[in-house]
Amino acid sequence: MLFRSAVNTFSSAIELNPSNPFLYLNRSTTRAEMIDFISSIDNSYQRITIDSDPANRLNNNSKRTYSYDEAVADLNKAVKLFPDFAYAYYNRANLLALSGSLPEAFEDYTKAISLNPAFAEAYYNRGIIQLFMKDTRKGCLDLSKAGELGITEAYEVLKRYASLDN
């Protein structure tokens, strides 16, 4: 209920000031957090079935899918209004990655890094994306850079990843 109220408040503010990119950014964040909250409740609830056929149980227990489309649309607007704001690209990349659009997420992380070369979180996330996209060398380079910029967890990921290769 509070999420919906916050989204409505941001929507009203956008009607009054449609050229403020931060209103779109905040509405996007609120929408994404609302989806994550609802999803976490859904995913923690175990549905019990008496069906003995595993395929039917799998179909009956399949998770709902949630769309970040509205949140991404808000970030598209924020980027259009404030094209030099690295966090808008970063946030959009996060939502694109969660939606499975890895190449598009990679592009947005790259843009965020070009706007803010010390953006450690963007290097970290882009590195993870590159590992998923099977570009191990570049992924490891980005994770290393994230570590240099202060995300020590990046070194742990590199160690675990290296141990998988051996």
PLM regions: where:
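Alpha-helical tetratricopeptide repeat
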Residues: 1-166
